Every structure is written in structure tokens, then in C-alpha cells.
UniProtKB/Swiss-Prot annotation:
Protein name: Nucleotide-binding protein LI0459
Family affiliation: Belongs to the RapZ-like family.
Keyword Oxidoreductase: no
Keywords: ATP-binding, GTP-binding, Nucleotide-binding
Biological source species: Lawsonia intracellularis (strain PHE/MN1-00)
Binding site for ATP: 41-48
């Protein structure tokens, strides 16, 4: 399910309410559809996880929003100077007595102002919701009315029936792990999948004599490459210098290694991305962390950026090497 498949259904649904849709809210940088996602549903069905995923996808997110503030918040985000905003995802405070009526009024107001929105409803079966509450040890919001958890969930489900019936998407998360839900939402709502990959890459160059980075997911030992330390004119330089980079990368082993490294990561990173991983830390080490690891890390930064990954780099021991 993708946004392009959802939009026509939204147009049909919202036009049936006697409101023609002339133009959606647009992001500041790309004149394309600007997703506004309203999240409601059963407590424990995954709303907080969904909001975290949307935040990772560069949407502005907020939880516990009263329905009366939704429209004004949409206009605030649309008119702000926030960079790289890809949309807005709002979790609604649905446990006040008059929330359902307020939500209906809010939806009518949004339609009258020609605002596209997707109403995402999350649910799960009763045993699963009870199990999740047992794991988190948090009280259900309706338990404040001196009723038990199961009764609170039943009452919540009853209150939400009108909203569920009008939802654009009803997602049953009973069999979903957190990672399953993340994968589904990333695949369905990444607005620019060919331009922005979900997974973030963190590259660290380091020196083995100072210790291996604890946060490394992938670690490469580069001490097999020719060492510029033993070349007098290169010793005071770092892998950031062109002479050192040329010495390392254009060596016989360097040429072969960089080819195999890029090919390996081109195979592996999409698999991590498809699994719903948020970040991968790649650590590349040499003896002192000044020459070889820095040169290869800078090459990797360049190559992965070309493949549209979001990449950060840290030369942890370059000044010590």
C-alpha cells in the first residue's frame, strides 16, 4: 500500500461529502502531496510506535492532540519555515467524553478547507491488548473511572466504532511485532522512497590501539592495506589529505577492497532497510585511526551519499593517531 494508491480513495471519500478537493497542502521544498495522517484506535495497538516511525520519516509528529487543535496545527506546520518536513502525523486524545463529536466536526472542517488527510485506525484483539498492557504496566486511560482493564478496552472499542467505520485504513496489529509495524509504515508512507532511504548510516573511523567502538554493527579491519605511516612525507598527514587517500585507495589491495566493500554494502544495506532497521553503524579501523581508516571512511561516505543514503561520519581517533 502506497500513498499514490491511497490518494484516489481519499479524493473519492472526501468528495462524497459534497466538498471538492482543489489543492492539498504542499511541503516547502517539493511540490508534491503533503501527507496529513490522523492516528486513532485502541490503546495498546501501536499508536506510539507509529508516531516514532513517522518522525523517522521526517514528518512532524505530536501525540495527545485535542481534536479542536488539529486544523490550526496543520496550518501552523504548513506555514512554518521548518526544513525537510515531509508531512504531519497526529495522535488524537480520544478519551475525553465529547471526543467523537469533536473529531467529526474537525474532519468536516478539514474537508471544507480542502485539506487531504488519511485517517489511520489501529486495533488488535483483546488478548493481545491485555498482554501488551501487562508488559508495559501502564494503566488504561479509562481505568480512572474505576473499571478493570478488560472493561476499559471494551468501552473504548465501543466508543470508537463510528471513527473506525470512517477510517481510510484499519490496521490490525495483533500479529505485528514493533519491527513489523515499522516495516509496514515505512513501506507505505515513505513519500520519496527513491530519494530518501529510511535507514541512516553512521560511519566511524578509529584506531585499534585506542579501542573498538562499542556501537559498531559492522566492523572492518583495514590493517592489511599499505600503511602511509611508514612513508615519511605522508606520516604527518591524515586520510583526509589527497596524497594519503591516493596512496591507500590506489594500491593493489586498496583498489580491490573498495570495489568489494561497495558491492557488499550495496547488497547488505537494502536488506537491513527492508527489515525496518533505523540506523547502521559501520566502523572501519586501522592501527592509529589516522590514515587508512579515514581514507576508506571518506570514500564510503561519498559512495553511500551517491546512493541517496543519509550518512554521518566521525573520525574518532584521527587527531590521536
Amino acid at each position: 500500500m502506497t500513498l499514490k494508491k491511497i490518494i484516489p480513495n481519499l479524493q473519492k471519500t472526501q468528495n462524497n461529502n459534497n466538498n471538492s478537493i482543489s489543492s492539498p497542502l504542499l511541503p516547502h521544498t517539493v511540490q508534491e502531496y503533503f501527507p496529513v495522517i490522523i492516528i486513532v484506535g485502541m490503546s495498546g495497538a501501536g499508536k506510539s510506535t507509529a508516531l516514532h516511525v513517522f518522525e523517522d520519516l521526517q514528518l512532524v509528529t505530536a501525540d495527545g492532540i485535542p481534536p479542536s487543535l488539529v486544523t490550526s496545527m496543520i496550518h501552523t506546520v504548513q506555514s512554518s519555515s521548518l526544513e525537510h518536513v515531509q508531512g504531519l502525523a497526529l495522535g488524537i486524545n480520544q478519551h475525553r467524553i465529547h471526543t467523537m463529536q469533536e473529531l467529526e466536526h474537525t474532519f468536516q472542517e478539514m474537508r471544507s478547507q480542502h485539506i487531504y488527510f488519511t485517517l489511520l485506525y489501529l486495533e488488535a484483539d483483546m488478548p493481545t491488548l491485555i498482554k501488551r498492557y501487562a508488559a508495559t504496566r501502564r494503566p488504561h486511560p479509562l481505568e480512572q473511572y474505576h473499571i478493570g482493564l478488560e472493561h476499559a478496552l471494551e468501552e473504548e472499542a465501543k466508543r470508537l466504532i463510528p471513527i473506525r467505520q470512517t477510517a481510510d485504513i484499519v490496521l490490525d496489529t495483533t500479529t505485528y511485532s514493533i519491527h513489523d509495524l515499522r516495516r509496514f509504515l515505512q513501506k507505505s508512507w515513505n513519500p520519496y522512497p527513491e530519494k530518501i532511504r529510511s535507514i541512516k548510516i553512521n560511519i566511524i573511523s578509529f584506531g585499534f590501539k585506542y579501542g573498538v567502538p562499542n556501537e559498531a554493527d559492522l566492523l572492518f579491519d583495514l590493517r592489511f592495506l599499505p600503511n602511509p605511516y611508514f612513508v615519511e612525507e605522508l606520516r604527518p598527514l591524515s586520510g583526509m589529505d589527497k596524497k594519503v587517500a591516493t596512496y591507500v585507495l590506489n594500491s593493489a589491495s586498496g583498489i580491490k577492497f573498495k570495489k568489494h566493500l561497495i558491492r557488499f554494502l550495496s547488497f547488505l544495506l537494502p536488506l537491513y532497510d527492508a527489515e525496518g532497521r533505523y540506523r547502521i553503524t559501520i566502523a572501519l579501523g586501522c592501527t592509529g585511526g589516522k590514515h587508512r581508516s579515514v581514507a576508506i571512511s571518506e570514500l564510503l561516505l561519498h559512495e553511500l551519499t551517491k546512493k541517496n543514503y543519509t550518512v554521518s561520519i566521525e573520525h574518532r581517533h584521527m587527531e590521536l593517531g
